[in-house]
Structure formats: structure tokens, C-alpha cells
């Protein structure tokens, strides 16, 4: 019995202009054929499955909301515990860093690390910032906005990450 090691030419990635899961947040979790050519997946495969690449983009891995009264960041950090996360505010930026040491999973050993930096609006009250991690791995960073003309208090400080036992209430986009 022959086993094909290389995909046929029409199922291979066609270069940097086509979406691929190789370098996104799911690195190390496997790559599917429909991730390489999502626009052809419905024509090639009789059993069409929605591309995970498109689903992930639509779900809002990192979502920033800024309305009149509040500034909120939602970030999917399901592979990290609160002890693995560092959240700090420095001047007009919030920096979220996650790192866990090498651990074993289904496919071998893996270690993960990310660093995100977001600009805070100038009218966010930095003394009232909060950060929590839901049971389903959604990090929520939020802060109220102050009325214009008041000092928002810009200094460097760490924001503790609290753990919630319920899943996130963040609606998907």
C-alpha cells in the first residue's frame, strides 16, 4: 500500500499571499489542508468544513472596545494560568505578557510565550484598572474613562490578574 507523503500540487500552499495557520496563535496544534487554501476547500472537498483560520478571525482572539464610559480588552489566553501572565501599565500603554515553561502535550513538549501592547486612551482612569481571567481562558482588562479635563493618573504599575470560575461573557464578533 502506497502512502502519499506530499500533497498534490493543487492542495499545496501557493506562497505568502494565502492565509496559513503556520504562524498564528495555534502554532503547534496541527495544520489542516483547508487552512492552506480556504477558498478552494469547498470545491475540492465533498465534505466541506469551515476554515479554522476564518473562524478564529471572526471569533476575536484579541478584541479592543472603547466606548464613552469604558475601555476593555478581551484576549484569549486559554493556554496560560494567572501565574503565567503579567499585566502592567506604563504611561499610555498596557503590556500583557504570557509565558509558560516547557510542558508535555499530546504531540510532545511545548512552551509558549506572547507579548501584546495596547495604547490606552488618554482619559482612562489608570487607578481603577482591573484584569480578570475567566474559566474558559478569556483575559478581560478594563478601566473606566474619566470626564475630560480630569487627570487620569499616568504611572507605571502592575495589574494583578484575578481568576473567575465562570466562562467569559464576552460576545464574539
From Swiss-Prot:
Binding site for Zn(2+) 3: 154
InterPro entries reported in the protein's UniProt record: A-crystallin/Hsp20_dom (IPR002068), Alpha-crystallin/HSP_16 (IPR055269), Alpha-crystallin/sHSP_animal (IPR001436), Alpha-crystallin_N (IPR003090), HSP20-like_chaperone (IPR008978)
Positions annotated to bind Zn(2+) 2: 107
Pfam family, one: HSP20
Subcellular location: Cytoplasm; Nucleus
GO biological process: lens development in camera-type eye; negative regulation of apoptotic process; protein refolding; response to heat
Entry-linked Gene3D superfamilies: 2.60.40.790
Ranges where the record places region Required for complex formation with BFSP1 and BFSP2: 1-63
Residues noted as binding Zn(2+) 1 in the record, renumbered to the chain: 100, 102
Similarity comment: Belongs to the small heat shock protein (HSP20) family.
Protein name: Alpha-crystallin A chain
Organism: Ochotona princeps (Southern American pika)
Amino acid at each position: 500500500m502506497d502512502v502519499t507523503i506530499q500533497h498534490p500540487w493543487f492542495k499545496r500552499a501557493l506562497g505568502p499571499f494565502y492565509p496559513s495557520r503556520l504562524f498564528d496563535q495555534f502554532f503547534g496544534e496541527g495544520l489542516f489542508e483547508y487552512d492552506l487554501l480556504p477558498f478552494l476547500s469547498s470545491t475540492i472537498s465533498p465534505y466541506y468544513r469551515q476554515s479554522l483560520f476564518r473562524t478564529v478571525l471572526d471569533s476575536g482572539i484579541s478584541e479592543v472596545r472603547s466606548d464613552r464610559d469604558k475601555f476593555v480588552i478581551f484576549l484569549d489566553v486559554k493556554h496560560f494560568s494567572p501565574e503565567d501572565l503579567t499585566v502592567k501599565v506604563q504611561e499610555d500603554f498596557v503590556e500583557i505578557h504570557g509565558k509558560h515553561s516547557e510542558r508535555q502535550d499530546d504531540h510532545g513538549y511545548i512552551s509558549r510565550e506572547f507579548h501584546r501592547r495596547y495604547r490606552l486612551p488618554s482619559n482612562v482612569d489608570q487607578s481603577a484598572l482591573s484584569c480578570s481571567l475567566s474559566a474558559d481562558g478569556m483575559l478581560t482588562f478594563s478601566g473606566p474613562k474619566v470626564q475630560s479635563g480630569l487627570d487620569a493618573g499616568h504611572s507605571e504599575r502592575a495589574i494583578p490578574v484575578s481568576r473567575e470560575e465562570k466562562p467569559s461573557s464576552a460576545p464574539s464578533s
